[in-house]
């Protein structure tokens, strides 16, 4: 079943908000492996490891490198708090 629901992804560092976009799927580099988040996912708070944050929208994939931090998923919003983002 196709869905038009999207996730909102917000990435924040101590200096500024780096990203505020929508995506079909967000892949997070958690401390114990990757976590794929799709619309409708149950709420969670987790610790991020160093790795690649990916936003999938249709056939487009955008990537950023994170240096750890924390992620919250709630009501189709993925919030990432990290010290450093590159990409």
Where are these regions (language model features)?
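Compact, glycine-rich, soluble single-domain proteins
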Residues: 8-87
